[in-house]
Amino acid sequence: MADHMMAMNHGRFPDGTNGLHHHPAHRMGMGQFPSPHHHQQQQPQHAFNALMGEHIHYGAGTMNATSGIRHAMGPGTVNGGHPPSALAPAARFNNSQFMAPPVASQGGSLPASMQLQKLNNQYFNHHPYPHNHYMPDLHPAAGHQMNGTNQHFRDCNPKHSGGSSTPGGSGGSSTPGGSGGSAGGGAGSSNSGGGSGGSGSSNMPASVAHVPAAMLPPNVIDTDFIDEEVLMSLVIXMGLDRIKELPELWLGQNEFDFMTDFVCKQQPSRVSC
């Protein structure tokens, strides 16, 4: 079949100007002008058509060589399909389905950030300190996930519940209805189940009140983040709720060590702990 096409092209281009009758572009019949005096004018076009001929089937739909060039060139075409010399080779095939997509913009990365915030939602904490300078407005569209009301975490460290260490002396609660603090600089109650709401979080935006642990300042890096629902589900899954004698859950480590040492000394027949 190739010999038949070459014979047809030999009859079509009898003079064989510059040896172009052996070119794949002319064997495929991709030339636009049949007369020989147009070949020298269209020689770069024919050469680029032959170059792009094997890439046309990667495009979408059926197209000829010229439309394939313009489709593959995208917005970088000049002079109706002739590529500029400084154009990168990757830019000529930027619409091919085998090429990587362009660099994602900020709008493309926003859904991924929102999905990560959904996955990390249990690590957001309602903290009494207003960290305005620690909370840059990175994702304003995802702010509704940070100021939600379904936050089940509270700060279980009582040393952060006082109101005298906050700017202006206003204390705050780690959960709505949690431990309260006096607005004049007085110490708040350490009872985490108190009924009075904190007054320190009222002068803060809702998007700043819930900040992730990685964005907290270093002075509260030792704050305990405890989710009671996750903890209880872990206890139920391990069967610890059915075990009645677990002194290490109710006593400190020193008392537990003392009890185990005392019991082991009283009963020497047992294996030592």
From Swiss-Prot:
Interacts (via C-terminus) with SMAD2. Interacts (via C-terminus) with SMAD3 (via MH2 domain). Interacts with LHX2 (via LIM domains). Interacts with WT1. Interacts (via C-terminus) with EP300 (via CH1 domain); the interaction is stimulated in response to hypoxia. Interacts with PPARA. Interacts (via C-terminus) with TFAP2A, TFAP2B and TFAP2C. The keyword ATP-binding does not apply. GO terms for molecular function: chromatin binding; transcription coactivator activity; transcription corepressor activity. Gene3D superfamilies: 6.10.140.2200. Transcriptional coactivator of the p300/CBP-mediated transcription complex. Acts as a bridge, linking TFAP2 transcription factors and the p300/CBP transcriptional coactivator complex in order to stimulate TFAP2-mediated transcriptional activation. Positively regulates TGF-beta signaling through its association with the SMAD/p300/CBP-mediated transcriptional coactivator complex. Stimulates the peroxisome proliferator-activated receptors PPARA transcriptional activity. Enhances estrogen-dependent transactivation mediated by estrogen receptors. Residues 137-204 are annotated as: Disordered. Keywords: Activator, Developmental protein, Differentiation, Nucleus, Repressor, Transcription, Transcription regulation. Residues 165-200 have a biased composition (Gly residues). Belongs to the CITED family. This is Cbp/p300-interacting transactivator 2. InterPro entries: CITED. It is found in: Nucleus. It comes from Saguinus labiatus. It holds the Pfam family CITED.
